[in-house]
């Protein structure tokens, strides 16, 4: 049984003992009792990813492609995995600025956590505010909130403005297609 995410930590904690013959994998989480006790039993594997590494590469790639201007970051919930994406992204931008001749800023007011991974409308609203303030590209580590940001980028592009998104977790290029005939997407890359 593969459990995607920290919200299933307590369920796996209970299930791994109750169903000793079953095998469990939990992604981005460690089985725990909801308190201070955690246990990865012999029938369970806990897997974490190095989000900061893909965030870094996305930051460098986006900075090289755009060259100069303001970037933004929209996170879903403020949890360690999403924070690692943010940190890596910021470090990638800084690296590109210091070593590769780019001039990208990631201002504090353009780093926002929506609070959920499901509020599509909230993601669109946050992205609209950022694009309207001059942000050129937004990294979205936010689940469905990121789909809202992608939708807003398409709206901005339809209005003749520059708007890019850096997707997360999988290749989101197709989510950002706004010109099917020419296969053009608002998704610059994905981490």
Roles of regions detected by a PLM:
Residues 1-191:
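A residue-level marker of the well-folded mature domains of exported/periplasmic proteins
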